[in-house]
Amino acid sequence: LVGSEMCIRDRYISGEISRQTRGAIDAFRAMGKQCKDVSGGLPTFISPWIDGKKAVQASSGRLTKAESISVETHEREWNEIFDGIHDVVDACAFQDGHIDYDELDAFFSVNKKLADKYGMQCWTNAESFDRDMPIKFFPIKFDKLRLKLEAAKRAGYDKAITFEFSHFMSPQSAYLQAGHLYDRYREYFEIK
């Protein structure tokens, strides 16, 4: 509670998946149902990643991988996943950092189309750190964050969340660049 107001309005199912992994649909369905049962039916959301070319282990020295998911395969697999979970998961905020900037529109459009098909909300999870640098990870340049947010808007998304504000965008972060990223964000959206 904050004062007399409930501050939790939904439940986040924190398990992360990207593709149709064996048992994923059943696991997310069970977790979504449990969240709904214990919360009295509050909305639930997930934030999966897209198995794009930037989906490499943070501990590796690589920035990209040779094999990545096509838009068509992503659509087919997530159609099956959404079909199995849409009655217990209300929203999906795909992480945007594993695909390249020239792929944002294609993947975002597919995500929105599938979410609409299954009556789910589609948000973006705009990563506020940069996967394009050999040192992992620094706060992202605002121009790159803006590109991702604008692609989400073009696809019809009406909500955005970010990972990871406290490290990569907060004025209180140990990274000096994080405070500057926050300032650019506020300027762009005319937030006083």
Outline where the language-model segments fall.
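Short, small-residue-biased leader/transition segments that mark boundaries at the very start
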Residues: 1-8
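Substrate-binding surface in catalytic domains of secreted glycosidases
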Residues: 11-22, 93-110
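Aromatic-lined carbohydrate-recognition surfaces of secreted/lumenal glycan-active proteins
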Residues: 28-75, 91-97, 118-131, 162-165
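Short, flexible/disordered intra-domain loops and linkers
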Residues: 19-23, 55-76, 133-142, 172-176
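Substrate-binding cleft of secreted/luminal carbohydrate-active enzymes
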Residues: 96-100, 121-192
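Acidic (Asp/Glu)-rich catalytic clusters
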Residues: 33-35, 80-87, 111-119, 150-156
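Alpha-helical scaffolding within the catalytic cores
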Residues: 29, 64-83, 103-114, 144-148
